[in-house]
A protein has these predicted regions:
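Long, acidic low-complexity intrinsically disordered regions
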Residues: 245-266
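Core nucleotide-handling region used for phosphoryl-transfer chemistry
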Residues: 2-218, 234-241, 269-630
Length: 630
C-alpha cells in the first residue's frame, strides 16, 4: 500500500477548528431563537468530544461525533463544515506530556442515496453536491480523465474500524463512535476497571427519583422550620420576662443542645451525602464503561483474526510487515456472525468483512484509498472482504452516470436475499495514470426501501383509544356538576334525587360510548391515511424505475401492499408488543418475498427481551446510538 506522509490538516489544527465551530454555535444559541428548519436548533450542530484514558501513560483518546443523532442526515446534507470535517468514525490521540494531538483513526465520509434524476439538466441540489460534487469538479478542471465506478455489496453487520499507530505501538479498535487503544490482550482489562476512569466521570447518573428527592428536601425543611419556631418562642418568652432564672438556664442549655444537635446532624448529613455520592459515582462509572461494550468485543475478535489469519498462517515477521503497511490508515468493515445481533441476512461464522481503507492524514483531500489498493491488501493478509464489481472506464462523466442509472434499475429489482440492502458505489477517476475515489453513494433494492417505508409508517400508528381514561374524565366532570347541584337543591326529596342520579348515569354512559366511538373512528381514519401514504410513497419510489418488475406485475405489487397493510394493522391491534410485529414481519417476508431468511432461537430471545412489554410510543423510535451501540 502506497505511503502518503503529507498531511492536509494536522490533528492540532483540526481540534482547534472544531472547538472554534462549537464556540460560534454556542454564541448563536444565545443570540438566536428562530432556527426552525427540520425543527433543528443551533445546539443540534454542536460537535461532541468524548475524552477517555488509555492503558498508555499520559495518552488520552478522544472520540469525535455530531451531538445530534435525530437530525444527523439533515445536518450532514446541509452543513458543508460538518460534511468536510466529520467522518463516520473519527478519533484523536491527546498526549498530555507533549500537549499535542495525533490522528488515531478515520472512517469513511457520510454518504447518501444516488438518484437517477442527477443526470437531468438543471438538477442542482445539496444531495447531488454530496454524491457527485467532487467528481463534477474533476470533470470541469481536468483533461484526459477516465471515469469508472466500483459496486460493492452492502454488508449487513455492525460497523467495525481498526487502525495501527506506530508512534504508540498500539491498535485503535472501534465501533462507529467509540474507540479503544490496546497493545495486547492484557490492555483489554484496563477498560473494565472503574478506577481508571474516576477522574473522567461527569456525574451524569441519578439514583433518586425526583419525587423521592423532593420528599426528603421537604422533610428536612420542615424539621428546620420546627426547630427555628421553638427557638423563637423561647426568645419571645425571655423578652416578656415570664421565665425565671432557672428556666432561662434550662432554655440556654436547650439552645446549646439544639445547636450541637444541628452540628452533629449536619456532620451526619455530610457523611450520608458522601456515601450517596460514592454509590452514585460507582453506578455512574458502571454506566460509563458500558459505552465500550462493542469496542471490547471487537478487540477480542481482532486479536483472534490476527492470530488465526496472519500469525498462524505465516510467521511473526508478517505481522510486523502488516503493521508497517497499515500505519496511519484505518481498515473499515462490518462485524458479522454474532447470533445475538443478527440482521436480515445471516452469516454462518463470526468474522469481520472489510470493504475500505482510509488514510488517517487525508481528512480533507481523500474519501478513501482506491479500492484496488485496499483489496490487494485484504488478499495479501488473508482478511475477509466484500464482493466488488468494477465497471468499464468511460471518457465522460455523463457516460458514467448513464451506466450507474442502468445499475440503479438492475439493483432496484433484486431481492433481499440477492442484494440485501443494495450496493455502495465508489465514484472513481483516473488522472495521469493515478486512481482516486471522488464520491460515494448508495443504490438500494425496492424490497429494502419498501420495508423501511413500512417500518417508518408503523412508528406513526396512534395508540389504541383508552376507554377507561375517557370514562374517568367524563365521570369527573359529572361529579363536579353533581356537587354544584346538590348545594342548590338540598331541600329536594330523596325520590327525585334518585331519578336524577339514574338520569345522570345514563347520560354519562351515553357520553362515554359516543366519545369512545368518535375517537376510534378518528384513529381508524388515521390508520387508513397511514396505509394510503405508504402506498403513495411506494409509488413514488416505483416512478423512478418505470420498467421495474413491480410496475409490470400488478399482482406482485399488490402482495407487497397487502403485506405492508397487514403489518400496519397488526401494529394497530397491539401497540405494546413490537416483538410479534417483528416476527410476523420476517415470517411474511419469507413467504411473500421467497427470501431464505433464517431465524435462530438466540435472535428471537434477544428481540423478545428487547421489545416485550413496552407500553409507550417510544417502542418505535430509532434504535441506536447510545454510544455503546454505535
Amino acid at each position: 500500500m502506497e505511503s502518503q506522509n503529507n498531511i492536509d490538516i494536522t490533528a492540532n489544527e483540526l481540534y482547534e477548528k472544531l472547538e472554534s465551530w462549537n464556540k460560534d454555535i454556542k454564541k448563536s444559541i444565545d443570540e438566536s431563537k428562530k432556527h426552525k428548519k427540520y425543527s433543528l436548533k443551533p445546539k443540534d450542530l454542536l460537535i461532541k468530544f468524548n475524552r477517555m484514558p488509555t492503558p498508555i501513560k499520559d495518552l488520552e483518546l478522544i472520540d469525535i461525533k455530531l451531538g445530534s443523532k435525530i437530525y444527523e442526515d439533515e445536518i450532514f446534507l446541509e452543513k458543508d463544515f460538518i460534511a468536510e470535517n466529520l467522518r463516520r468514525g473519527e478519533s484523536l490521540f491527546y498526549n498530555k506530556s507533549e500537549d499535542s494531538y495525533d490522528y488515531a483513526r478515520l472512517g469513511l465520509p457520510k454518504f447518501f442515496d444516488y438518484q437517477k434524476s442527477f443526470l437531468e439538466i438543471g438538477t442542482e441540489n445539496k444531495l447531488k453536491e454530496r454524491v457527485l460534487g467532487k467528481i463534477i469538479e474533476v470533470s470541469k478542471n481536468e483533461k484526459n480523465v477516465k471515469y469508472f465506478v466500483y459496486l460493492t455489496t452492502k454488508v449487513n453487520g455492525e460497523n467495525f474500524q481498526v487502525s495501527y499507530n506506530s508512534k504508540y505501538d498500539c491498535w485503535v479498535i472501534a465501533s462507529k463512535n467509540v474507540s479503544i487503544a490496546i497493545r495486547n490482550k492484557e490492555d483489554i482489562e484496563f477498560y473494565k476497571n472503574e478506577k481508571n476512569f474516576e477522574e473522567y466521570y461527569q456525574g451524569d447518573s441519578r439514583i433518586e427519583t425526583m419525587s423521592e428527592k423532593e420528599k426528603k428536601i421537604k422533610e428536612k425543611k420542615d424539621k428546620k422550620m420546627e426547630k427555628k419556631k421553638k427557638k423563637l418562642e423561647r426568645i419571645e418568652r425571655r423578652k416578656k420576662g415570664k421565665n425565671e432564672e432557672n428556666d432561662n438556664q434550662n432554655e440556654n442549655e436547650e439552645d446549646e443542645k439544639d445547636d450541637n444537635n444541628e452540628n452533629n446532624e449536619n456532620k451526619i448529613n455530610e457523611e450520608e451525602k458522601n456515601d450517596k455520592m460514592d454509590i452514585k459515582k460507582s453506578k455512574g462509572l458502571k454506566e460509563m464503561l458500558k459505552r465500550f461494550t462493542f469496542s471490547l468485543e471487537f478487540a477480542e475478535i481482532w486479536l483472534k483474526i490476527l492470530q488465526e489469519k496472519i500469525i498462524n498462517n505465516s510467521n511473526s515477521d508478517l505481522i510486523n510487515e502488516f503493521k508497517k503497511e497499515l500505519g496511519d490508515h484505518t481498515l473499515i468493515g462490518e462485524s458479522v456472525g454474532d447470533k445475538k445481533r443478527e440482521h436480515i441476512l445471516v452469516y454462518k461464522e463470526r468474522d469481520v468483512i472489510f470493504y475500505g481503507i482510509v488514510n488517517n492524514k487525508k481528512l480533507l483531500s481523500e474519501n478513501c484509498l482506491p479500492l484496488s489498493n485496499g483489496f490487494d491488501l485484504f488478499k495479501k493478509y488473508n482478511l475477509s472482504y466484500t464482493e466488488i464489481s468494477p465497471s468499464q472506464k468511460f471518457d465522460s462523466l455523463e457516460d458514467l452516470c448513464i451506466y450507474i442509472n442502468e445499475q440503479f434499475d438492475v439493483i432496484f429489482d433484486k431481492s433481499l436475499q440477492e442484494s440485501g440492502e443494495g450496493n455502495v458505489i465508489y465514484l472513481s477517476c483516473e488522472i495521469d495514470g493515478k486512481e482516486y475515489v471522488k464520491g460515494l453513494g448508495k443504490l438500494k433494492t425496492f424490497e429494502y426501501r419498501f420495508l423501511r417505508k413500512v417500518r417508518e409508517k408503523c412508528k406513526t400508528v396512534p395508540p389504541p383509544v383508552d376507554r377507561s381514561k375517557i370514562e374517568f374524565e367524563i365521570k369527573k366532570k359529572f361529579n363536579e356538576l353533581k356537587k354544584k347541584k346538590e348545594k342548590k337543591k338540598k331541600d329536594k326529596d330523596n325520590e327525585k334525587a334518585e331519578d336524577e342520579e339514574k338520569e345522570m348515569i345514563e347520560k354519562i354512559n351515553k357520553k362515554i360510548e359516543n366519545e369512545t366511538k368518535e375517537k376510534n373512528q378518528e384513529r381508524d381514519k388515521r390508520i387508513n391515511n397511514i396505509i394510503n401514504k405508504m402506498k403513495s410513497e411506494s409509488k413514488t419510489l416505483l416512478n423512478e424505475v418505470p420498467k421495474s418488475k413491480f410496475n409490470n406485475d400488478k399482482d406482485l405489487l399488490k402482495e407487497y401492499y397487502d403485506f405492508g397493510e397487514y403489518l400496519i394493522n397488526y401494529r394497530a391491534k397491539d401497540l405494546t408488543n413490537y416483538f410479534d410485529v417483528f416476527a410476523s414481519f420476517i415470517e411474511v417476508m419469507k413467504e411473500k418475498f421467497k427470501a431464505k431468511v433464517e431465524i435462530n432461537d438466540l435472535l428471537i430471545n434477544e428481540i423478545r427481551k428487547k421489545f416485550e412489554g413496552l407500553i409507550s410510543d417510544n417502542d418505535f423510535k430509532e434504535e441506536g446510538d447510545e454510544d455503546a451501540k454505535e
